[in-house]
Amino acid sequence: VKLTNASYFIQDEWKFAPKWTVTPGIRIDHHSSFGTHTSPSISLGYDVNAKTNVYAAYKEYFLAPTPYQLFDGFNGNRNLKPETGHEFDLGVHHKFGKTWNSNLSFFSRSTKDKIGWVMTNPAAFTGQYRNFDTEKAHGINADVRKQLTKHLSARLGYTYTHIDATPTRKANRDGYVPKHAVNAGLDYNDAKWDAHLDIRGIINRPGTADNVFPRKTYWLADISANYRVRENVTVFGRINNIFDTYYAEQSSVRWGNPGDWWPGQGRNFRLGLEVTI
């Protein structure tokens, strides 16, 4: 089976008044199996002052099933429909000073024929990709970044997500999408070195039943560094899950036995050399 998908996109930013900017756009997808789909978008921005900008944006989208979702011998479903939907965003960018930047936004999204995997035979642990009912979601994104020194910066972000339950799935896609997520970090950059501390917090991950996941709330920390020996030679190192936190992002407890999780990786290390030719 041969599938082709050609996409074309054009947008134009138009400053139609001293403080106002509008950016219309359009994307056209032509899929060999699902035809032609047109997805418009538009955003409107207003500069309140030199430090603050507010904006509103609307976009539509089309997402065809992947070849794996369609044709895999165990999970595939040739009757899948493409996902279509729209999203609305409303937000504000604000600079508290020369070294402080912040963003706050609200989003609302509606997806028709959302594609997801469904267990069809718990005894054999086999399933199939299917289209769900319309999926509606809304949430908040907030982040702030501070330049501490010439080379060192800090960042903090928070996301709240709520995905409505459907007749076949509970809220937040059976708990696989957390309600609250926190991201924080430190970044160091200079001519030779860059180093990063990344912290991720998953808070209140709901599930279809008790103990679907070993922890509903957990925190992970990673650290990495790169040293540029020459323009085309870099030595790198990384420690993932520094505190060896036990967690799982996939689970079969609903269909199997207590503790049937796919745990995430424990503490692990990477060290290497990258040469660009």
Identify the function of each model-found stretch.
Residues K112, P206, N226-I277:
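C-terminal beta-signal and adjacent terminal beta-strands/loops
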Residues V1-H31, S39-S41, K59, H151-Y158:
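Surface-exposed extracellular loop regions of Gram-negative outer-membrane beta-barrel proteins
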Residues I10-D12, I42-Y46, L90-H94, A142-K146, ...:
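Residues on the lipid-exposed face of transmembrane beta-strands in outer-membrane beta-barrel proteins
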